[in-house]
């Protein structure tokens, strides 16, 4: 075992459940994520916020080990496991689930087939019955092609598909994008329930007020750098901070 792994294992009881430390990511020569560090406690929701182009999605993709952007320096840990040493499929097996902004519903497959496909490789997480209990609309449309669902229903399917894996960290990129307020409220209630079951979540959302009301803590990025880390309530109460970095 390496000195790095020994050190981490020895301090595991004190280490945060999730942490990224001084991560630097690039799209080819473009320096996107510039030395970002933060941690998330188990069962916590963290809102990752900032203006357009701040590096939010790039940070999520770096955590998920998508390879684009490429992590060139820094460490990422989840429950004692070094994500920074993993490829994307290894990070998924380790418990990372990314729900991208475009949801990536697979054409030609039904709702149920989209979920079943995610469970082909172990370890698996929530059962179909549990997912349908969480999202009754999916149960009603289980035999319908996934890409024919409404935007809100596709978002439910994308989240349900992620939960069907043995998930430890849920990464959500713009989950409220294009959704009616009533559907946003439904998704919020779902995320609150998932949190009550111990799920750790990082949410990137342009609707900063909605994300802050949901989250326990917040991180704000500006041009790829971290400019704030603290309680979500403090951001809601700090007009100057909101105006300067979130334009709200």
Enumerate the language-model features and the residues they cover:
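Glycine-rich phosphate-binding loops of nucleotide-dependent enzymes
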Residues: 2-248
């Amino acid at each position: 075992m390496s000195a790095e792994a020994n050190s981490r294992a020895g301090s595991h009881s004190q280490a945060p459940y999730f942490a990224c430390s001084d991560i630097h990511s690039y799209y080819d020569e473009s320096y996107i994520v510039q030395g970002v560090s933060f941690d998330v406690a188990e069962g916590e929701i963290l809102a990752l916020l900032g203006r357009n182009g701040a590096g939010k999605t790039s940070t999520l993709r770096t955590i998920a080990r998508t390879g684009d952007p490429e992590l060139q320096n820094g460490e990422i840990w989840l429950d004692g496991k070094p994500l920074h040493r993993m490829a994307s499929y290894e990070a998924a097996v380790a418990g990372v689930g990314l729900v991208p902004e475009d949801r990536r519903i697979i054409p030609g497959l039904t709702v149920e087939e989209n979920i079943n496909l995610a469970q082909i490789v172990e370890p698996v997480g929530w059962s179909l019955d549990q997912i349908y209990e969480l999202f009754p609309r999916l149960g009603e449309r289980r035999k319908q092609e996934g890409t024919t669902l409404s935007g809100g229903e596709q978002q439910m399917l994308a989240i349900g598909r992620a939960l069907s894996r043995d998930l430890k960290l849920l990464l959500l990129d713009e989950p409220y994008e294009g959704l009616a307020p009533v559907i946003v409220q439904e998704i919020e209630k779902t995320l609150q329930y998932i949190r009550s079951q111990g799920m750790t979540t990082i949410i990137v959302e342009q609707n900063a007020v909605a994300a802050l009301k949901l989250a326990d803590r917040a991180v704000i990025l500006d041009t790829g750098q971290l400019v704030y880390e603290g309680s979500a309530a403090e951001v809601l109460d700090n007009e100057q901070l909101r105006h300067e970095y979130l334009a709200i």
